[in-house]
Amino acid sequence: MAAPSLLNWRRVSSFTGPVPRARHGHRAVAIRELMIIFGGGNEGIADELHVYNTVTNQWFLPAVRGDIPPGCAAHGFVCDGTRILVFGGMVEYGRYSNELYELQASRWLWKKVKPQPPPSGLPPCPRLGHSFSLYGNKCYLFAGLANESEDSNNNVPRYLNDFYELELQHGSGVVGWSVPATKGTVPSPRESHTAVIYCKRDSGSPKMYVFGGMCGARLDDLWQLDLETMSWSKPETKGTVPLPRSLHTASVIGNKMYIFGGWVPHKGENTENSPHDCEWRCTSSFSYLNLDTAEWTTLVSDSQEDKKNSRPRPRAGHCAVAIGTRLYFWSGRDGYKKALNSQVCCKDLWYLDTEKPPAPSQVQLIKATTNSFHVKWDEVPTVEGYLLQLNTDLTHQAASPDASAAPNTLGGRTDPHRQGSNSILHNSVSDPANCTKPEHTAVAARGMSLKSKPDSRAADSSVALHSPLAPNTSNNNSCMADMLWKSEVDEICALPATKISRVEAHAAATPFSKETPSNPVAILKAEQWCDVGIFKNNTALVSQFYLLPKGKQSMSKVGNADVPDYSLLKKQDLVPGTVYKFRVAAINGCGIGPFSKLSEFKTCIPGFPGAPSTVRISKNVEGIHLSWEPPTSPSGNILEYSAYLAIRTAQVQDNPSQLVFMRIYCGLKTSCIVTAGQLANAHIDYTSRPAIVFRISAKNEKGYGPATQVRWLQGNSKKAPLS
């Protein structure tokens, strides 16, 4: 976590969609990039389900159906994959619940579930302010507040410290409640505490950590329950323990438990024997406990003022959600403002990055021209941008053999084929019962080599991959992916010859050549990385880069320092026939993360044919039928086409990124049959989803041009390609 002075809070000020009413006592969970909020309230209890997309900054109200639960507050709310469970809470003043509901978020379908009672004893009583934590296939319920009175208007509070275990069925439904026999001293009764579960990587014993809460007075004690031995203990901690509090939030990211907000003593820590020890206030203090070392670290103290409104104001009863390494905070009771008949609640949404982002995937090529690249990389969740850099050493630009022959070298690495294209498979099958909606995946960069059947044609290692973008595609993420059709049993759809899948391939790298660039740039020293720029999205059109100032090896910044002023730097154009190395790093509120692995691409050389386009794959009795359209820019007469299949070899097993290709077709036709026997030797590429890889290239009078790569996704990697 960044030092306290480097905390970079962000308030989300621009969003769309129906924003939920400000409230307190609500709960939130995360499903991938979605923050899902339910319950809570202020002037009445809310019963809507609100969803916030952290990528698009959009709020929406899903159309839920089924056994829709009543609105509740201070309830239990956990997420298991795409299943959400709601337990208990206050449904109206003085009336609490012990009902359990399940939401299948993939269908927005609610269902009321009825778990079996414990083998001995009663099920949990109605309550609010309890903790409800998930680990594996079990939920753990601890403590809360019950109403002893049968009359909801006559509230007689009873603090609880009971402990229940709820076993879940796989996918949907529950088995029942049980009351585990625990050892050691049980924590005192409480409500509005927090409980999280953490398991060290090197020792597989999960622990539940309970912190704070309310039992007539606020608490600051920390308890640990070993979920294997069911032993309670009070771990000894180091550092400054946060003030006693309730209605705070606790979130685990990595090995840290982050505590934010809540009700704390009004006079700080010196409240013993004070006449004001019953006065309380909201706080915006922020601390974390290292769960491996049991050491507390204060990031924002209770006494630390915020005159610039640069972080969330004091609050309680808010929600906090961890998405990746980013924490989101929404709403809650305002710590200062008051109203006659209701609390004043915060309307703001904040987030805080707790770590620098991880390295993105290698830069992947979509399109190459003589003086530009269109590149992409896989998205990194919860980042604010990407720094793209390139490196080139023009003194070491390698010449290649004559590019007039088919690319069918035997074994070994073939530099021109370092990068495969990204493909989109458009399903043209009209029968919706046989295929599901396509799923998206990206093709990662990789090296490769070629292997062919005996052939009288000369070997050539000068062919690389490039093809133009399809004219009807856009530059959004959906254009840079394979799409997979699967039946209900997770198999590839069997397509008859008359019903085909369309493949539009985007690109690969370009051919090496003996030609010398006509306008060479100034020679750069090796390992000098120049900025291409900072990009909001995970795609970039690269035609220029910024030259380094004299004496500098890199423009990378440390921490969250400002980015360079590119207007003061000189630009340099890309030149034909030149190899460029690329790397990319993600940026968030903590600064610039580590760079990706390197990728190398080469700008095109004029005169070679473009890549074949509109590739189609369909199954037939012999195997599969592979067809394509001629290049849109043949640059002369097309003399022949070559098609290749990535095959299994010991070399690929040792280095999966080094694909070996076998030529399966050479001729003038724009189609070929790939037999079942050939497919039996196919290599299954696991770069993203399991896939069989084909490459197709065209040859004119000057030689072979770049190839189009197609990844034929396999729904079940354990089955043969045609099973």
From Swiss-Prot:
SUPFAM superfamilies, A to Z: Fibronectin type III (SSF49265), Kelch motif (SSF117281)
PANTHER family cross-referenced by the UniProt entry: HOST CELL FACTOR, HOST CELL FACTOR 2
Family matches, as PROSITE patterns: FN3
Name of the protein described by the UniProt record: Host cell factor 2
Polar residues: compositionally biased ranges: 419-433
Taxonomic path: Eukaryota, Metazoa, Chordata, Craniata, Vertebrata
Fibronectin type-III domain span: 357-436, 516-606, 608-720
Cellular component terms per the entry's GO annotation: cytoplasm; histone methyltransferase complex; MLL1 complex; MLL1/2 complex; nucleus; Set1C/COMPASS complex
Kelch repeat placement: 34-79, 83-130, 207-255, 257-305
Region (Disordered): 398-472
Subunit structure: Binds KMT2A/MLL1. Component of the MLL1/MLL complex, at least composed of KMT2A/MLL1, ASH2L, RBBP5, DPY30, WDR5, MEN1, HCFC1 and HCFC2. Interacts with TASOR.
Disulfide bonds: none
Localization: Cytoplasm; Nucleus
InterPro entries per the UniProt record, alphabetical: FN3_dom, FN3_sf, HCF1/2, Ig-like_fold, Kelch-typ_b-propeller
Entry GO MF terms: transcription coactivator activity; transcription coregulator activity
GO biological process: antiviral innate immune response; chromatin remodeling; immune response involved in response to exogenous dsRNA; negative regulation of transcription by RNA polymerase II; regulation of DNA-templated transcription; regulation of toll-like receptor 3 signaling pathway; regulation of transcription by RNA polymerase II
Alphabetical UniProt keywords: Cytoplasm, Kelch repeat, Nucleus, Repeat
